[in-house]
Amino acid sequence: MPEGHSVHRLAKQFGSVFAGERLAVSSPQGRFSAGAALLDGGTLLSALAHGKQLFLRFDGDRVLRVHLGLYGAWSFGGDSTFRGASSIGAPRRVGESEQPSGSGDGDGDAYGGPPEPVGAVRVRLVSAHGWADLRGPTACEVITGAEEEAARAKLGPDPLQPSSDGTVFVRKVMSSITAVGIQLMNQAVIAGIGNIYRAEVLFLQGINPWRPGRQLREDEAAGIWADTVRLMKDGVREGRIITTTSEARNGRPKRSAPNYVYKRTGEPCRRCGTPILTAEMAARNVYWCPQCQAA
């Protein structure tokens, strides 16, 4: 499932290429025809990410709310004046390349339109110079501005929103006996963290994922927030989750050793050499170093 940094990249992408544009909205697959009809011909005013949810705000008090879930992804394309990451979502190819398509030759030629839909395209957005296709989302609906506020009110603070208050997270996580590893995956506690960030942040803080939230010191909870903010900002910039330092990678490329513990079961810890462990926690695999995260 794309984590919060990917959705923030999406919001930035939509704001860059579609904000202020009148859009033709359709549902080639047919499952979103009624919603598409409500948005068709509207102007995209802004795009906002909160955790793993994307809110595309149109005029007329209409908002397209999208949650990509495990399999959702957006694809972009257009003429030479349009720039979009080729795919954002699942599978993770975030920001690897820009692949404009169309008749543009670099001088802003007339846009010939998007290609024929490929696969089950739930939503297609088309502007004068480009297009975006959505496939496989968990949630895709048209709501009002008030309903957007209500949806966001159910979410915890987002580490990538400048207005988010980390003390809200600290209070929430420390007030519960639930294991911190479970709480970090609860979007009502902190919005945007997924399995990778959970594993990596807890490793960096030296915290065992099974420790109850009430047993955390305030500085530990604050450290979780601070590391999450830092790593997710890096994720937005890099287009992928890289948590290791160059020293921990022993000079290897980022892509060859991107994480400390995530999906490294049985491999030696990059700090102490102890084999990394994994176990199921609330139906998801969690990874940790039993030596570095003993407490």
Language-model segment annotations:
Residues 1-295:
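Structured catalytic/nucleic-acid-binding cores of DNA maintenance enzymes
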